[in-house]
């Protein structure tokens, strides 16, 4: 990712934070632009990826040979029982750190 990409990602993260911190309960449940995913699922997807960037889970003993879409589902599934507040908290805890990790790879 280029420095311009990092700058754009920081802007996008800030815009997402602005939106998701003001969501109502009903808005969390609305369909997102991703077919089959709610806004909640989409935020869980982003937060799980940011968490994995900062604090990766241990590698599985056996390789997992799944399509990328199914791998993303596996990251979201454990969060199905989380409250919206827990998903929001995870996003806020890891989003800026994840951008910093990606930025450090450019140095």
Segments and roles (model prediction):
Residues 1-14, 36:
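Short, extreme N-terminal leader segments that mark the start of a protein/domain
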Residues 45:
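Histidine-centered divalent metal-coordination motifs
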Residues 10, 14-17, 92, 96:
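Generic alpha-helical structural signal
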Residues 1-4, 49-107:
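Short, helix-capping/interhelical loops that line the mouth of catalytic, cofactor-
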Residues 38-39, 83:
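Short, structural beta-strand-to-alpha-helix junction motif
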Residues 17-38, 59, 101-107:
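Helix-loop segments that flank and shape redox-cofactor active sites
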């Amino acid at each position: 990712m280029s420095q311009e990409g990092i700058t754009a990602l920081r802007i996008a993260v800030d815009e997402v934070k602005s939106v998701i911190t003001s969501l109502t309960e009903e808005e969390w449940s609305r369909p997102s632009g991703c077919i089959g995913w709610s806004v909640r699922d989409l935020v869980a997807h982003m937060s799980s990826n940011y968490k994995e960037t900062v604090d990766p889970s241990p590698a599985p003993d056996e390789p997992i040979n799944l399509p990328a879409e199914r791998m993303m589902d596996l990251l979201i599934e454990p969060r199905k029982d989380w409250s919206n507040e827990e998903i929001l908290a995870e996003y806020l805890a890891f989003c800026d750190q994840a951008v910093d990790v990606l930025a450090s790879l450019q140095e």
